[in-house]
């Protein structure tokens, strides 16, 4: 057993974290074992840099949603519960959509899932929108500094549907969802656009532009963690 000790400053005190090698459940704070990842929320806030950060820009919407959710979960302890609840409902709804193909009588039960999905979804949309706005404000200044003022970065939230329209669009898409056997609208299909000098660099940016933009995003996330925790 190899044990390493690291002291992390928090809002409450200087907590002692133990990381144990080769142990699936090898994290403890002040001697108390951490059994769920969510227990670390609000205790230790980390922004990790890696070569894979470039994927935030160049890969698909799923990568960018993971970035948003990862950062929001650090800043908002309730968000992880809302996100887990929403994802559970989407999975259950998709299963029900498939079951409706063989048993059309189950269609009436979709209303219950839709109501819960809209409730969770509106909260997620609102928090993602606010986070992207904050991120954009910080990233613009940081990016100008990184590029010597040559490039102007803009980050725009691209929700699958607005919070105000979610309930109506989910209802209007029901027949389509039944045919496709999946849920076609909601935060699980969100994205955000990254522009440099007005050009969408997700599709048309050079690797250098994408790398610098990804760095700006991560540095901005650090600033948000510092100011909001």
Spans of features found by a protein language model:
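Nucleotide-state sensing region of NTPase/ATPase domains
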Residues: 7, 11-63, 69-79, 136-141, ...
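Conserved NTPase motor "head" modules and their coupling/switch loops across ABC/AAA+ ATPases, GTPases
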Residues: 101-229
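Short, exposed "boundary/linker" segments that immediately precede the start
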Residues: 1-6
């Amino acid at each position: 057993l190899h044990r390493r000790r690291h002291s992390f400053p928090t809002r409450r005190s200087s907590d002692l974290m133990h990381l144990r090698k080769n142990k699936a459940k090898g994290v403890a704070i002040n001697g108390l074992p951490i059994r769920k990842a969510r227990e670390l929320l609000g205790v230790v806030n980390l922004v990790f840099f890696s070569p894979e950060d470039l994927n935030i820009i160049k890969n698909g919407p799923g990568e960018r949603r993971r970035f948003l959710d990862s950062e929001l979960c650090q800043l908002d302890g309730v968000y992880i519960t809302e996100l887990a609840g929403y994802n559970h409902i989407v999975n259950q709804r998709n299963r029900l959509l498939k079951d409706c193909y063989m048993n059309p009588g189950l269609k009436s039960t979709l209303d219950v899932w839709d109501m819960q999905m809209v409730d969770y979804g509106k909260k997620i949309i609102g928090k993602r929108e606010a986070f992207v706005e904050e991120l954009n404000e910080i990233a613009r200044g940081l990016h100008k500094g990184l590029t010597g003022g040559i490039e102007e970065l803009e980050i725009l939230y691209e929700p699958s549907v607005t919070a105000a329209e979610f309930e109506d669009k989910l209802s209007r898409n029901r027949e389509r969802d039944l045919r496709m056997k999946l849920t076609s609208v909601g935060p699980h299909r969100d994205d955000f656009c990254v522009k440099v000098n007005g050009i969408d660099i997700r599709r048309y940016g050079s690797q250098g532009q994408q790398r610098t933009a990804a760095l700006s995003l991560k540095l901005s996330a650090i600033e948000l963690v510092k100011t909001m925790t």
